[in-house]
Amino acid sequence: MDLNQISETLSAVAEEEPLTMFLLDKLYAIREKIKQVPFSIVRLCHVYCMLIKYNASNNNCILGRKLIEEMQQFLCGARVDGSEDVSMDMSELCKLYDYCPLLCSALCRAPCVFVNKLFKIVERETRGQSENPLWHALRRYTVTATKLYDIYTTRNFLEHKGQQFFGEAVIYGAKHERVIRHLVAIFYVKREVKETLGLLLDPSSGVFGASLDACFGISFNEDGFLMVKEKALIFEIKFRYKYLRDKEDHFVSELLKNPTEKSFSDFILSHPVPAIEFRERGKIPSSREYLMTYDFQYRPQRKLRTCPTPAILTPHIKQLLCLNETQTSTVIVFDCKSHLSEQKLSVFQKAVFTVNVFVNPKHRYFFQSLLQQYVMTQFYINDHSNPEYIESTEVPSVHIVTALFRRRTEEERSLHLVIDETEYIEEEIPLALIVTPVAPNPEFTCRVITDICNLWENNICKQTSLQVWAQSAVNQYLAACVRKPKTP
């Protein structure tokens, strides 16, 4: 069975018993107790049941084996050594499908370490992201980073299923994500390229989820489970297709010939809608572009566009701007050297400089970054031996990487692109990266998380009459992220 068939079958299973139907069918009998059960527990049970139903009819392709084994053993009270091969008897597992109320109640009494382990199994089982059918299935009932902005600003939960674009820009972005990740690792972070993570479901609420494009400052234990270290770095990658041009383009050639901020700003302004929005200090930006600046050398000739700020964001936008306007971006300009005898193009760093460019907090990508940082911080807190002693400088930080490429020349078409001995065959040529740190306001992040949890609970109640508890961990997040006063 190929990936498309697996995805279609798993999607059919998910549609056959959506989350609301699962709540009514399996948990309505314990409706008085369900409001005392954190939704994170309910979510694990729903994932378990979905996997059981899929695997029962597809013995030739078992999904989520480790998660099923752990929950099966827990429910049965069995203790099996991790190295032992546990038999997957689907007929027996299907019987456990009817024990969801018991499983929910039992997991509520389970040690936090065990529950956190289950969420780490979910992450491990969904690695590969878009190439993993389970990743797609679990995102269905999750407030992901791409949905956060719309849900928060419109107060409408059910209508937002996330943006889905399938144009050439998205295809190019997906095609170049691996090479961009490699460039960040070699030329910015200067660390080894790490495996991409799967879906990070928020272990406190079970409502939120994040999928990271790149992450550093992590490790994996002997079971392959994620371990988040202090000062982990998160990178959200954005491929700017609208700047993909030929090498002979005037602004491309000028940037390569004399890589300075002047040639860089000229390149940015050469597009009718510049990727960096200029505003005078004190003015509120539009929400069109996710990067902005107060620097006049990025001021376009045409009239600046304005748009209203969503009402719920209006009281906070100036404070969020003040936090982020102090950040600077790093620009790395690349060129390549051809080795015709070896049929290779080796990429090298031609220049690096900083620019007064920062993230626009009115843009949806800012909110995307907030959720990624929040969820990753939950994993860091759970991994920490003394969470109460976490300093604000130790929690994960997030950067947005803007990738600019140029097209290959005719002579370069047959050459392999080489970055640190790794070869890329079809990708275009890197021109520049803009690496921009995001400065979140922990109090604002907590407000967003709390508001959406309440909104989510109300929507579930309207659909099922069940009072489901979407527990958040905003207090422990705030304690970790806010600078602690120095003791005398």
From Swiss-Prot:
Main location: host cell
Keywords: Endonuclease, Exonuclease, Host cytoplasm, Host nucleus, Host-virus interaction, Hydrolase, Nuclease
Function recorded in the entry: Plays a role in processing non linear or branched viral DNA intermediates in order to promote the production of mature packaged unit-length linear progeny viral DNA molecules. Exhibits endonuclease and exonuclease activities and accepts both double-stranded and single-stranded DNA as substrate. Exonuclease digestion of DNA is in the 5'-> 3' direction and the products are 5'-monophosphate nucleosides. Additionally, forms a recombinase with the major DNA-binding protein, which displays strand exchange activity.
Positions marked as site (Required for function): 177, 213, 236, 238
InterPro entries named in the record: Herpes_alk_exo (IPR001616), PDDEXK-like_dom_sf (IPR011604), Restrct_endonuc-II-like (IPR011335), Viral_alk_exo (IPR034720)
Family: Belongs to the herpesviridae alkaline nuclease family.
Full protein name: Alkaline nuclease
Keyword Nuclease: yes
Enzyme Commission numbers on file: 3.1.-.-
Gene label: U70
Subcellular location: Host nucleus; Host cytoplasm
Quaternary structure and interacting proteins, as annotated: Interacts with major DNA-binding protein; this interaction increases the nuclease processivity of the alkaline exonuclease.
